[in-house]
Amino acid sequence: MHTVFYVSDGTAITAEVFGHAVLSQFPLVFEQVTIPFVETLEKARQVRARIDEQFRQTGLRPILFHTIVDPLVREEVLKAQASGHDFLNTFVSPLEQELGVKAEPRLHRTHGMENRKLYDDRIEAVNFALANDDGITTKEYEEADIILIGVSRCGKTPTSLYLALQFGIRAANYPFIEQDMGALVLPTALKANRHKLFGLTITPQRLHEIRNQRRANSRYSSLEQCEQELASVERLFRQEAIRFLDTSSHSVEEISAKILEATGMRRQLY
């Protein structure tokens, strides 16, 4: 099994994202190691030694994805017995020529606190998502950018938090529960913010599997209950002309991207 190292003088998030995107094209399993904050020559030598040791143990040259600003630190890491792939410098040189401007590399610029306001906005969005999770309160819905609605366990909470953390979007979410199903209508708080509503749904079988992990062999997790709840909620979505998305086979990243595409909400990139 090949070992993949993600090495950076910052958080290594960029190296991980780039590396994961590339490696997903191959039908292989990799052992993955992330090493952030390699900011000194001493740390670089330790990383080099670790990579070389992995090569000696496995006989397979490790794959190295790196984003290192300091050229001396980068050169030391690249002395390792690995297949090195530099995400940043691959694109920086062509862009310098195109833009006619010399790049000014700086540590922690990508995922640091270069723009304090954007960082604060993101943290506030996360706090908002937590405070308005699962219908805890509906008093702050006027401040929401979006309100996700759907049955319990269809992906509302993780999507709300991802939208907040990744894009600084204030996302609330509201669950429809078994007691609502007899005569399902939009609650007053949702009606007042109807233009912010976005529905999430899921297949009955997938919902049954997820709920069964939480409350096995209960009415809540039974396939019949899942089918009934989903039928009622999807009927409401159609009656009220609320846009909705099936989350069954999508990751939280994909769900979020599809919501942004459908709503046209502005992304705040960090």
Curated annotation (Swiss-Prot):
Gene Ontology terms, MF aspect: ADP binding; ATP binding; phosphotransferase activity, phosphate group as acceptor; protein serine/threonine kinase activity
Keyword Isomerase assigned: no
E.C. designation(s): 2.7.11.33, 2.7.4.28
UniProt keyword list: Kinase, Nucleotide-binding, Serine/threonine-protein kinase, Transferase
Record has Transferase as a keyword: yes
Record's function text: Bifunctional serine/threonine kinase and phosphorylase involved in the regulation of the phosphoenolpyruvate synthase (PEPS) by catalyzing its phosphorylation/dephosphorylation.
Name of protein: Putative phosphoenolpyruvate synthase regulatory protein
Origin species: Aeromonas salmonicida (strain A449)
